Design a protein with these regions (language model features):
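Bacterial N-terminal signal peptides that target proteins for export
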Residues: 1-18
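Conformational coupling and interaction surfaces
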Residues: 33-34, 51-55, 60-61, 199, ...
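A residue-level signal for conserved active-site and pocket-lining positions in enzyme catalytic cores
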Residues: 94, 208, 274
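Structural signal for hydrophobic packing residues in well-ordered secondary-structure cores
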Residues: 84-88, 143, 147, 212, ...
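Active-site histidine-anchored catalytic micro-motif
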Residues: 33-40, 44-82, 116, 122-225, ...
Length: 355
């Protein structure tokens, strides 16, 4: 093999060959971006997650579907359109989905997200037009158009995803993976048991968890450790531009809200799911079977993770049941149990700053 100096002499001696080599290197295909459908209820942290997705070359956002949750379906659609317009991405279809959860009344969260859902920041009117397709139908169409290539990244209640599965179960084996923000195996943030996205439509969440596809749950165990601090805010404020300034404003609102409650920073809930879609090595996962509690008086919306992998086998004998052993329970989810918070936060800041 030629030394480096020898290679340089060879290239100088044969400039035509050097040109061919350069052309070949430039023509080499780049690593394919991961195709994602971003399902969202924007929402402040949804806004942060969307901007992270749009600023990550590893991701190819094929569609944005809007679900009610943090805000109403109508407000969420308007927010999504204004954000893609701000980012100059009118090429991405934005579609309205469900108007309400499957069975219960909607619970919105202006207290945490501002009156308009975007930290009370008034973005310019959108230059983008809404896609006329129903969100779950758009999800189904895109999955069939790119079988085994689409990753679903829902960061709100799972109503749209559940409706798509119920309408066309054949999409399940055609989805590459589902990376969702929601749930917790260590306690909730709405109450002692439930996380907000799951709580806002437990029946939909149970459908999604039991569908049978590759699923990663990015829950409170990640977001509660990845806290966006005043230091991160200062770093973000070093550069300016329409997207950067908007994200700075949202984070300033959230950090201020966190400080009111004595926290050192604002949890990066929804951006964490996007970050995991970009780089799965950010988190540590544990495979387990997850069910969603849909009936409990105090636990409705809880994601119940079976970390042991088995359940007691009870057999009826006369007037009582007798435990006769254990039955294995197959895992249906990879549950994120830990995160490299510093690396996740630096990814977020650097991507928004365009570095």
């Amino acid at each position: 093999m030629l030394s480096f100096a020898g290679q340089v002499r060879w290239l100088r001696a044969f400039p035509f060959a050097a040109c061919l080599l350069l052309i070949a290197l430039l023509a080499a295909p780049a690593a394919a971006s991961k195709k994602i459908i971003f399902d969202t209820d924007p929402g402040t942290d949804d806004a942060l997650a969307l901007m992270l997705a749009l600023n990550s070359p590893e991701l190819d956002v094929r569609a944005i579907t809007v679900v009610p949750g943090n805000v109403t379906a109508e407000m969420g659609l308007e927010n999504a359109l204004r954000m893609v317009s701000l980012a100059n991405r009118c090429d991405i279809p934005v579609a309205a989905g469900a108007k309400h959860p499957l069975f219960q009344k909607l619970i919105t969260a202006e207290f945490w997200h501002g009156k308009n859902g975007l930290a009370n920041i008034e973005l310019p009117a959108s230059k983008c037009k809404v896609d006329g397709r129903f969100g779950p139908d758009l999800i189904i169409q895109l999955i069939h158009a790119s079988p085994h290539e689409i990753t679903l990244v829902p960061v709100g209640p799972l109503t749209n995803i559940a409706l798509a599965v119920e309408k066309d179960p054949s999409i399940v084996p055609l989805v590459k993976e589902v990376i969702l923000m929601g749930g917790s195996i260590t306690g909730g943030n709405v109450n002692a048991a439930a996380e907000a996205n799951i709580y806002n439509d437990p029946e939909a969440a149970q459908i999604v968890f039991q569908a049978g596809w590759a699923l990663t749950m990015v829950g409170l165990e990640v977001g509660d450790k990845a806290l966006f601090t005043p230091k991160n805010l200062d770093e973000l404020g070093e550069t300016h531009g329409p997207v950067n300034d908007f994200v700075y404003g949202v984070n300033k609102f959230l950090v201020g809200l966190a400080e009111q409650f004595g926290a050192t920073g604002s949890p990066m809930y929804d951006p964490s799911a996007v970050a995991v879609a970009v780089d799965s090595t950010l988190v540590k996962v544990q495979e387990m079977h997850v069910d969603v509690e849909t009936r409990g008086e105090f636990t409705r919306g809880e994601t119940v993770g079976n970390r042991h992998g088995d359940v007691e086998r009870n057999v009826l004998h006369g007037d009582r049941y007798i435990i006769e052993g254990l039955d294995k329970v197959a895992p249906n989810a990879k549950v994120c149990v830990d995160v490299d918070a510093e690396r996740l936060l630096q990814m977020f800041v650097s991507r928004i700053k365009g570095k």
